[in-house]
Every structure is written in C-alpha cells, then in structure tokens.
C-alpha cells in the first residue's frame, strides 16, 4: 500500500497483520487484494512482493475459493463477500490453493469489514488450514 493517502483503517490494519503469526490479508471495498502478511506468504508459497495487488477476480482465480473437486466457486456469499456486503464479520470454510505446488487445502476463514461512517474501507481476513484429523471428527 504505497499510495500517498491510504485510509487510516487500512494503514492500521496493515500494521496489525504484519505482526500476526496467523495468516491474514487486507482488501479494498471491492474485495481487491491490497496486502498479505508473512504467515500468509508462507502458506501461499509466494511473498506479497511477488504477487502484488490484485483485483478480486484475479486473486480468487489464483488462490481460490474452490469446491471439493477443485472448481472455482463464486465469492459473493463467502466470508469476504458477506463482510463487504453486510458490514458484519463473517466466517466460513472452503478450499484454497496453498503453496507453490498448487495443493488445495481446506481453510477456515474469518472476514471483518473495515468501516468508517458512511463507507467501507475494505476488509481484514484471517485464515488457517483445517487440520485433516479435525475435519474427520464431529
């Protein structure tokens, strides 16, 4: 986020997630990728500097979400879409492409809208792989 005039919540969000051990990313109000932290880079197999900012459709195509068969799924009713549309936190589970080898893994995702009075600045999203042993239990 090198633009001269970044909204304060996005600057604060970037400062917060930079130090998190939990994989996290920031988006703009349209869901475009603005930044992800080192923990996310480790899971994705690429640094933010290698990936850069991406429109929502492009980063969804590269990283997911995908269904159980690996087909892309619409993002509108997943946590990020819900958080941006409804202005409230949202959580869900789906598959994403992790690591440079293209492996699809199930992740748990929480999305928090970044709101100012009368407008959205974007969203903060945290995610983590679902442990395979845990996914088989009830």
What is the predicted function of each stretch?
Residues 3, 113-138:
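Sensory coupling linkers of modular signal transduction proteins
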Residues 4-32, 38:
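Sensory modules in modular signal-transduction proteins
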Residues 12, 51-96:
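Terminal output helix/cap of sensory domains in signal transduction proteins
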Residues 41-42:
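Sensory helix hotspots in PAS and closely related PAS-like folds
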Residues 75, 104-106, 122:
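Beta-strand residues that line the small-molecule/cofactor-binding core
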Residues 79, 108-112, 126:
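PAS-family sensory domains
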Residues 91-95, 106-109, 124:
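PAS/PAC sensory module
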């Amino acid at each position: 986020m090198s633009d001269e005039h970044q909204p304060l919540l996005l600057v604060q969000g970037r400062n917060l997630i930079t130090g998190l051990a939990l994989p996290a990313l920031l988006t703009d109000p349209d869901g475009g990728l603005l930044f992800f932290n080192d923990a996310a880079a480790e899971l994705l197999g690429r640094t933010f500097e290698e990936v850069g900012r991406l429109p929502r459709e492009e980063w969804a195509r590269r990283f997911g979400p995908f269904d159980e068969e690996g087909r892309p799924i619409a993002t509108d009713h997943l946590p990020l879409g819900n958080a941006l549309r409804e202005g409230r936190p949202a959580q869900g589970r789906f598959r994403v492409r992790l690591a440079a080898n293209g492996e699809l893994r199930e992740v748990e995702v929480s999305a928090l809208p970044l709101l100012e009075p009368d407008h959205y600045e974007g969203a903060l999203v945290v995610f983590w792989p679902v442990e395979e042993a845990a996914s088989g239990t009830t």
